[in-house]
Amino acid sequence: MTCPDLKNLRNIGIISHIDAGKTTVSERVLFYTGESHRIGEVHDGNAVMDWMEQEQERGITITATTTCCHWRDVRINLIDTPGHIDFTIEVERSLRVLDSAVVIFSAVEGVQAQTESVWRQADRYAVPRICLINKMDRIGADYRRVLEQMRKRFTTRPVLMHLPLGIEGDFAGVIDVLEGRCLTFSETDQGATVETCDIPEERQSEVAAAREQIVEAAADFDDAILADFLEGRPIKAARTRAALRRGVLTCRLCPVFLGSALRNKGIQPLLDAVIDYLPSPLQAPPIAASPPNHQDATAEPALLPCDPQGPLCALAFKVLSDAGRKLTYLRVYSGSLRAGDEILNSTQGVAEKVARLFRMHAHKRERVTEVQAGDIVAAVGLKHALTGDTLCRAEQPLRLEGLRIPEPVVSLAVEPRHIDDREKLPAALEKLLWEDPTFRVREDADTGQTILTGMGQLHLEIITDRLHREFGVEVRTGRPQVVYRETVQNSARHHERFHRETEGRIQSGEVTLEIAPSGRGKGLRIVLPEDENPLPARLREELKKCLHQSCAAGIRTGYPLTDVEITIIEAPFEPGLTTEIGLLAAAQRGLSLAATQAGLTLLEPVMALELTVPTEHAGQVIGSLQQKHGRIDGLETRSESELIQARAPLSQLFDYMGELRSVTRGRGTFAMEFSHYDPAPDEIQTLYGLL
């Protein structure tokens, strides 16, 4: 049995490269749907969706913000995501729980580095999407070029649904190709009134050709449309829309619309497209849920449809510190949840109680008593929940796959300025750790300094700013440092036995393990095969946990060990003799010695860059990148500028924006994202005693 309201629900995200106009689009959506009585502007610092002080001051989105609105009797749960690579976890966790997405492109800049990154993230979760080519009013706007870039860079087929009425400064509206009409947006009421008119005679042939391309795309998903198309019979717009929707749901095509959010043009047709083409939770694929680790590990995952009558299964995808308490954002995939319910956090194996439930409107709340499958809410009272945890009923334990957490690449040493700051710092950092799984904290064993690790300089800058503003903690900061990775160059096998008296008891255990390189980008894999005398299940889990923790702490340098496969060849268990402490001590020391024998080496992060610079400065910029051990991957001429694609070690890119602005006289821009790890140079290996 399903809830009839689910067909009138959409869970969507707004994703794109930074500055493509995501939040500007979101603000118009709230205004035209009646959820907001004014249009907030990013450049004025009063956007509803950018509610953090840092967002308002910097004019960028830092945290994914959830709200809801209504259009054509359909409720839309909307998440506006950041575009900056330092906050990519916000996109990752949003796409993990959303049913669909709207991808925003700039008509001037086109497909940019972070656009490709968020597109790949959407591909990984098979998220259906539609697209808006925004900023059609800007000088240099070229929607045809953007379409061509989409065709070249993405496997999903773009289908142009609009043609522009005017270009650049004369952009006045759009031609709805499928319906055969012009749409303009009144300037007297900030675009709230949409006016229709006939297509000018001189554009008729252009529109007919564009409509033919739409019908061709639809015919791939409807044989009857294909037959009518080949026979030259008329095809109604409703049939075409239904076929296009099927293509969208399979992620094989994406309708593309035109607009200018800042000029209040093109948002209402985009909202119509959300309803017409994107799925309800009922049309989303069933979610795979497995028994928790302490249950039957051999059982096949259950495929749970979106059913309010099914077993409760929800994912905690975001945690905020709200006045010292946890506010946990949930996507409910199956079953229902009420305020006051006692539930199980199956990821951590602990009981939780839901005190209250809220529907979020940015940072404002609307209290609700119950939430059903398919919906997104926030809960208060979940004391243990962290990002990626599964919530279910104790009598029906289930476990969802967690989130893919990118590894941080930049670290920063901090010291409290005053004695009272030293006392407040640990609690403040703990609350920030709740919120952000890409943020890490450790203490330097030699200096005693607190080391913050994050996705980039901006990420850590925001963290330290929040320490001051939200928690009243002042810190001194050092220079940002690269977070390297350890790996091994060869294979090695080692047998280690631990036998020692500790506090009056003999602790004993032995392990034979092998470590081997697994290939760049493969991460860490620990293999613990079954044998004739297997360890008890609890000891197996503790052994794996111990090895994971040892690898995270590093072997020689304190940097995590990665791109290796560790196989437990033998771990004998003798009842009454083998102890947990002895077994784990043997494993820890055995791993250290095996990794050392296998030849430890350091890897450094390499970043993919996309730079836009004036043509006259391109040669100088390329030369400076090559001096930084960079590699040029591509060069594309765009009117009076050059688009440079390159890769360079992160260690060479700190403060690069200032250098680029100096070289280009303030006219150059760049974006970067993590690409891969390469062996660190010899001087770094020597510094850490590995050469």
Curated annotation (Swiss-Prot):
Subcellular location as annotated: Cytoplasm
Keywords associated with the record: Cytoplasm, Elongation factor, GTP-binding, Nucleotide-binding, Protein biosynthesis
Domain tr-type G intervals: 7-282
Residues binding GTP, per UniProt: 16-23, 80-84, 134-137
BP GO terms, sorted: ribosome disassembly
Coiled coil: none
Pfam family, one: GTP_EFTU
InterPro entries in the record: EFG_II, EFG_III, EFG_III/V, EFG_V, EFG_V-like, EFTu-like_2, G_TR_CS, P-loop_NTPase
SUPFAM superfamilies in UniProt: EF-G C-terminal domain-like (SSF54980), P-loop containing nucleoside triphosphate hydrolases (SSF52540), Ribosomal protein S5 domain 2-like (SSF54211), Translation proteins (SSF50447)
GO MF: GTP binding; GTPase activity; translation elongation factor activity
GO cellular component, one term: cytoplasm
Main location: cytoplasm
Source species, domain of life: Bacteria
Assigned protein family: Belongs to the TRAFAC class translation factor GTPase superfamily. Classic translation factor GTPase family. EF-G/EF-2 subfamily.
HAMAP family given in the database record: EF_G_EF_2_B
Described function: Catalyzes the GTP-dependent ribosomal translocation step during translation elongation. During this step, the ribosome changes from the pre-translocational (PRE) to the post-translocational (POST) state as the newly formed A-site-bound peptidyl-tRNA and P-site-bound deacylated tRNA move to the P and E sites, respectively. Catalyzes the coordinated movement of the two tRNA molecules, the mRNA and conformational changes in the ribosome.
Identification of the protein by name: Elongation factor G 1
The organism of origin for this protein: Syntrophotalea carbinolica (strain DSM 2380 / NBRC 103641 / GraBd1) (Pelobacter carbinolicus)
